[in-house]
């Protein structure tokens, strides 16, 4: 007898009511995509659960992949046995004996299939007695056991587990539409992308690159961050915008204290064009209320004016230390702090407006035509597709 399955439990997906099926189907697709390189592994779903059939594979590498799949609340290595009292006894004893350091245990039986003749409470007592009779130096503790042997009796078979691994929860990536992440290369925006994915959002990303003021290493840093994010979702397209000429024009032609605000508005205009082309429904940013000049309520109000797209700001109420802790936990922090400039850290005004007025911005913009340079910028966009294994180049065509 061996552990031959991984039992997957849903989180808030179980509360989705009539449309739960579409969430479960998407979760199954995402799981299959993450573990497709393991030969013979199969993913099956049943009422309220999903199972991965190991088919001779070691469970640990597969578990490491599954722990980062949004939509999974928890998982357990499981033994599958026939729905007979003797088989269930044997499986429960095997599961308990695998926990060599346990001094106390409890048994929890859940009888999903009422075709099984013994009620759950009675089966609890039968199994508890059997385990006590066939082990040494271990006692029952129903309140704080070292190990809980869980038995799920289903129509097709019984599944027995002896431990639970907490996962990331959330919703399966792809169930909440697609969003364009403004990815700078700093600490905040990758965390914003991660948190958006946790709510089921499928990401594409846009990066504003200003060579020679920003280097090729700065661009590669963004691609590396994107590759880290693919561990938690699907492949991600990154749209790299050649921003130098437009950025220089903004800082040359606009009042210095309003240049940062106008630059952000241009970023949103370009991002909106990509959203239209790629059928993306929203923008996601790493903005955090009150952190820097462009992230005051007044600045957001003025910058938002140029787009009708919803703007998702997952970090809006987090403090910097909280954001740093998440970035460390998800593996983006060390890349984010590499000392390469991005377009938002060059040409920084001495005293940027923290309370920019819409009417002033519109007045300044109306006195200079940025359209030719903006169209040239859009035509020069490069797109790369990032997976968790490779970087694939492709040209960005037909944007206009």
Swiss-Prot record:
It comes from the Bacteria. It is found in: Cytoplasm. GO terms for cellular component: cytosol. This is Probable tRNA sulfurtransferase. Its EC number is 2.8.1.4. Belongs to the ThiI family. Residues 60-164 form the THUMP domain. Catalyzes the ATP-dependent transfer of a sulfur to tRNA to produce 4-thiouridine in position 8 of tRNAs, which functions as a near-UV photosensor. Also catalyzes the transfer of sulfur to the sulfur carrier protein ThiS, forming ThiS-thiocarboxylate. This is a step in the synthesis of thiazole, in the thiamine biosynthesis pathway. The sulfur is donated as persulfide by IscS. NCBIfam families: tRNA uracil 4-sulfurtransferase ThiI. Keywords: ATP-binding, Cytoplasm, Nucleotide-binding, RNA-binding, Thiamine biosynthesis, Transferase, tRNA-binding. ATP binds at residues 182-183, 207-208, 264, 286, 295. InterPro entries: Rossmann-like_a/b/a_fold, ThiI_AANH, ThiI_fer, ThiI_N, THUMP_dom, THUMP_ThiI, tRNA_STrfase, tRNA_sulfurtransferase_ThiI. Pathway: Cofactor biosynthesis; thiamine diphosphate biosynthesis. GO terms for molecular function: ATP binding; CCA tRNA nucleotidyltransferase activity; tRNA binding; tRNA-uracil-4 sulfurtransferase activity.
